[in-house]
């Protein structure tokens, strides 16, 4: 993990014009025109994906609220409709010639996963959780001072595990579909324009899609980890890490291990988060030179962000998801006053 990045240029040259160096002026004009077409296509498909997913997920939540008697019934109904929503969403991308499935399977990862790298990646996710909880604590305090009493930092509810269907969606279906869409179809399409831009952009649209501030803070940082793993170690490893985060970390450790190992005021989950944070800080300090080199070698061409965030479809995607994110808090604020 973060060994040396001078190999990146050689790696790109070996793969041909599909992955040219984004800093080469000879390709700049071509890159801009090609990127405009790609980001426009991505924006249109993101809008379709968003509408389809939230429509069927919304139908499932409404049906569960109307008919469910127990927590198992509620999460079972929601889980079924989430499977439908995710499956149909994946089909939207799968049948596109612009985003062929073979690009994902044919992607050549420049690095091989080692036990040490895998352990550091897993620890980094716990470190990310620690940082996200600090951010959420600050946001929670700010909202409280504005007269909006909300709880953003809370333990995972055991009710989530009452339905096996919902657990399967959370631990298997969601990671697979999200990795296909955000890191596979989108990430591998944009990789040639600069890995750093690709990692940050896919992390942003991935986090916004959760439309929940509690999840968005964590999923943005986790999305950076997932995207880095997908690009550097391969799609299959991104799926594995994502599954571990959703199932092993969020369900097995946060719920069951926390109940089995009661450390008093300081829970086992908090201990793991703290250890992960310490490891993450050490990795950043010890590998800072390599991280900086990676950013320098793999940054996108000048103006790539301006082109991206002036696309109408990208703007609409961001605005709608921000609306869904903050609407509940505006409603609380209006009700309070």
Named regions from a protein language model:
Residues 23-82, 178-181, 244, 249-265:
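Transmembrane alpha-helical insertion/packing segments
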Residues 27-32, 62-69, 74-126, 138-143, ...:
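Membrane-helix interface linkers and caps
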Residues 75, 105-177, 329-337:
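Juxtamembrane helix-loop-helix connectors linking adjacent transmembrane helices
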Residues 163-337:
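Transmembrane helix-loop-helix hairpins at the membrane interface
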